[in-house]
Amino acid sequence: MIEFLIFGPLLGSLISGLMYRSIGEDVATIFTTSIVIIGALISWIIFLDIMPVENDTRVIFDWITSGALNSQWAVKIDSLVKVMLVVVLSVSSLVHLYSLGYMRHDHNWNSNENYKARFFSYLSFFTFAMLVLVSADNLLQLFFGWEGVGVASYLLIGFYFKKPSANSAAIKAFVVNRVGDFGFLIGIFLIYLYS
């Protein structure tokens, strides 16, 4: 169940981004939005203990194995993660719903341009990256989520790539994230070195 909450938005992102030509742009956007809304409802059910989920760490797969370093892709489940799942998925579902209406007749694109599926793919990838960030069991996975949020932010900020202001803002956000990445990596290396 928790795995669906984390990886559902990634599935929606991939389907919306890669299959919109075969299933249609409207179906892709509704599918992506539905996955996030279902995830939000499930996160509330788990949070309110209607369907109890034990505090645990669930290993999904071995991720990185190199010498003494063995990092697994795992989902941490505790009270804080349950709260953050509710926050991330609830806000994301509201953003997806709002975007359905807002993007329906966007005057920034021509009628023959496929833009909605791309936007919803980026938005759903942002949700996935944020969920990885808040449910990470180790620092490498946390960094992966951080990088995913940075990439998705860049893509969403620069979505209207025809506008020079959007391109400029996306580049600024990307550069600022790289500064944060540098500090984050130094912290990870120091923790690894001294532990």
Tell what function each PLM region has.
Residues 1-195:
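...captures the hydrophobic TM-helix bundle architecture rather than a specific catalytic motif
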